A protein has these predicted regions:
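Short Gly/Pro-enriched turn/cap motifs at secondary-structure boundaries
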Residues: 58, 224-229, 235-236, 345-351, ...
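Flexible, small-/acidic-enriched active-site or ligand-binding loops
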Residues: 340-393
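Mid-domain beta-loop-alpha active-site segment that forms a flexible
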Residues: 165-180, 199-207, 251, 255
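Aromatic-enriched alpha-helical interface/lid elements that frame and gate functional surfaces
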Residues: 233-310, 314
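N-terminal helix-loop segment corresponding to the beta1-alpha1 unit
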Residues: 1-188, 370, 376-399
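Conserved Rossmann-fold dehydrogenase catalytic segment
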Residues: 127, 156-166, 187-203, 223-229, ...
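Oxidoreductase and adenylate-handling cofactor-binding alpha/beta cores
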Residues: 145, 172-193, 205, 209-216, ...
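Conserved PLP cofactor-binding pocket of PLP-dependent enzymes
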Residues: 308-332
Length: 399
């Protein structure tokens, strides 16, 4: 789909490389520029005492890319990036704006070299405002600053960190979408543009329903416990064999009678305390207690059949071990085989990129590269002579 699109990725860690990997899975040619020593995420498992050749965290964001190592602290290294950008379609970076400007790698500088360039800047907080040059990571910019962390705290609880790269990869999707939209425009007009994505803005968008309520009414409801829900049947419950599951109640009175039948409490269908939304809200704790007792009389397998028979919208609360064996994950194409970096033809299971294109090659295009694996190849494609390439390696400008 994106075959023929050239992407220069000047980025480390996860959010921007994740966007680059989505584009690569979709067919773009992605060249990753790494600092001497490589992207720090290459060391993810070594920091916890392992020395794996395959690094599933790094590979997930970098499979199929080319890698060049350039010392961008040197003017000659910065010049090499400018050469690479001249015939690129996309420049993707998560370097802070101030550093890019000092290096002459900001949008205004690069668009003079390539007016059709789609330049995607992925930062913590955006390109304008007092915090534009502040370092950003997902737990700070996406999770904490946005209010998402606060909204997820149960009453009386404390803030807790989100899982690895949750906000990063959400922002990867946003950046990839923005890049694709700008590529369509560039194809129509012949002119590129600046695409601005940030962890902060994406975090605000993900909680946009609550933020919309806050902006409109000046307040928002706090996160309540199971027995305090406004819609108590939209909740989490536990089975006799200690399996948790969620129920999502539809609008109106659609689900109350079916749920009563599931737990064999048909007499409650017409009980005035519970037979309308207002009554259930006023008696939330009692509703939850009744359903807890009813659901707790069944093992998950038996209860699943009863819920399905009544067309209740529900889902199990799965562990990642459960997900890794879930047939629906494979049927949806959400788990794919990634070529091993060992180069022996073996593969291992890894998450797919977020969108499926039936009939298209939308999966991994190869293993993740070793640091600088393609440096000489890329320099040669820029027209550099063999002697020039050797000199660049000898000087430490590239590796």
């Amino acid at each position: 789909m994106l075959e023929g699109i050239k992407v220069v990725e000047y980025a480390t860690y996860m959010a921007a490389p994740g966007a680059g990997c989505i584009l690569r899975d979709w067919g773009a040619d992605v060249t990753k520029i790494e600092p001497p020593g490589g992207d720090p995420i290459r060391l993810f498992f070594r920091t916890i005492g392992t020395d794996l050749q395959d690094n599933p965290v790094f590979d997930f964001d970098n499979r199929g890319k080319k890698s060049v190592v350039i010392d961008t602290s040197k003017p000659e290294g910065q010049g090499l990036i400018r050469e690479m950008v001249k015939d690129a379609d996309v420049f993707l970076t998560n370097v802070r704006p101030g550093g890019l400007t000092r290096s002459g790698l900001d949008y205004e500088s690069l668009k003079t070299l390539n007016p059709k360039l789609v330049y995607c800047s992925l930062t913590g907080y955006g390109l304008e405002g007092p915090d534009a040059d502040r370092p950003g990571f997902d737990i700070a910019s996406f999770w904490s600053r946005t209010g998402v962390a606060n909204l997820t705290i149960p009453k009386g609880g404390e803030p807790f960190p989100l899982r690895t790269a949750f906000g990063d990869h959400t922002t990867s999707i946003a950046a990839a979408a923005g890049i694709c939209a700008a590529l369509v425009e560039a194809g129509r007009t012949g002119k590129g543009r600046l695409v601005e994505a940030s962890l902060f803005r994406t975090g605000l968008y993900t909680m946009g329903s609550d933020l919309a309520i806050q902006l409109f009414f000046g307040r928002v409801a706090s996160t309540k416990g199971r027995g305090e829900q406004n819609v108590p049947i939209s909740n989490f419950f536990q089975t006799r064999d200690d399996k948790w599951f969620c129920i999502v109640a539809r609008q109106g009175e659609t689900d109350w009678a079916p749920l009563c039948r599931v737990v064999s409490r048909e007499e409650l269908i017409t009980d005035p305390r519970f037979n309308n939304a207002k009554g259930r809200r006023a008696n939330s704790a009692e509703v939850v207690a009744i359903l807890d007792a009813g659901f707790g009389a069944y093992d998950m397998a038996d209860l699943a059949a009863r819920l399905d028979a009544e067309s209740i919208a529900w889902a199990p609360v799965q562990t990642l071990a459960d997900v890794s064996k879930d047939p629906q994950a494979f049927a949806a194409g959400a788990i794919v085989q990634t070529p091993s970096a060992k180069g022996d033809g073996t593969t291992y299971a890894s998450p797919a990129s977020p969108v499926r294109f039936p009939g298209a090659d939308d999966g991994p295009k190869g293993p993740s590269p070793t640091p600088g694996q393609h440096t000489a190849e890329v320099l040669a494609s820029l027209g550099r002579s063999e002697a020039d390439i050797k000199a660049l390696f000898a000087s430490g400008i590239v590796a």
